[in-house]
Amino acid sequence: MSKYDFSMDFYKGKKVLVTGHTGFKGTWMCRMLVGAGAEVTGYALEPSELFKLADVENKITSVIGDVRDLKHLQEVFDKAEPEIVIHMAAQPIVRDSYKNPVYTYETNVMGTVNVLECVRNTASVKSFVNVTTDKVYLNREWPWGYRENEELNGYDPYSNSKSCSELVTSSYKNSFFNTKEGGRSCAISTARAGNVIGGGDFANDRIIPDCVRAMQGGDEIIVRNPYSTRPYQFVLEPIYCYLMLAAAQYEDMSYAGNYNVGPDDVDCVTTGQLVDLFCTSWNAFYEKDDSAKKASWKNVSDRGPHEAGFLKLDCSKIKATFGWNPHWHIDKAMENIIEWTDCYLKGGDIPAVMDKQIKEFL
């Protein structure tokens, strides 16, 4: 199998359905797809602040709905007749999953079942990518990266629900899309992405949004676990990979499979190191602004629920298969985050900043 020569030009005129399109990654994906000339239908809960700022709603077909509602979801599929489906709708926060495990499992497991059922019942779909997480693996606190053939068994309700989502995808692929046994021809893949950072993430209990909120309030940044290690990557990195994978398997089903999507080892850093980088980048950006508070942080443990201490992905497979490598390291990612945040705080042109960063990335 030769390496796939991917270009965003592939998406011109393609019908793409994105679940979770109003969220952080979903909004960036829609902006990217719109720029490529795709016909995008989105299905998600009420819009996030970023989605409203990004000015994509009038450029796509945006449907507000819940992936737990199979009937409504199927109606959207029937009307859109998508060729490609990217499933990103989820309850994505570990701590929220401890507070509401039932909702987390309903959304992340049965939501995946419902989306795959719609794919099964929609003949136009040729390519499906389920976006999960690096946390699907049984975490043994190993110092090396997890590979795609490692055991799936997330610890907390969020991580475990995503492990289940992987199993659901595998079952549907084997049961309904196995062409050797008379199944319908549709390429099915999963993408297991590391921790994503970028401008416009307003979620609670995520470190970069916590940093930005602290700066907005003129406060010191609180870091609850500075020693945990995560595979941090700029938001456009995994989005590019999802779209590359969806395009490749659309044209050649042999590309379908399970793929880790993460940074190089040098960008697998502790939370404390990431916040150090944020503070350095923030202070450099506002060096000549006497009114700007200097960024600094302190460690304050809140004795919260269990979260993994060390987590890293082995991304050899996607690199070998597609010849892909991360475009930006986290220092460049942080520069873009500060640029986006400065534009936001000053009431600037957010769509222009997003398009600028997408253009530079591509």
Predicted feature residues:
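C-terminal substrate-binding subdomain of Rossmann-fold SDR/epimerase-dehydratase oxidoreductases
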Residues: 1, 35-38, 215-362
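Generic recognition of short, well-ordered alpha-helical segments
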Residues: 28, 75, 96-99, 110, ...
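NAD(P)-dependent short-chain dehydrogenase/reductase
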Residues: 140-145, 149, 158, 166-250, ...
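Residues in well-ordered alpha-helical elements
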Residues: 70-71, 83, 95, 102, ...
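Short, charged helix-to-loop "capping" segments that act as catalytic/coupling loops
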Residues: 48, 79-82, 120-126, 197-204, ...
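Asparagine-centered polar/low-complexity signal
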Residues: 107-108, 114, 195, 225, ...
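N-terminal Rossmann-like NAD(P)+-binding domain of SDR-like oxidoreductases, especially those catalyzing
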Residues: 1-193, 344, 361
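Short, solvent-exposed loop/helix junctions and linker helices
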Residues: 19, 67, 106-109, 158, ...
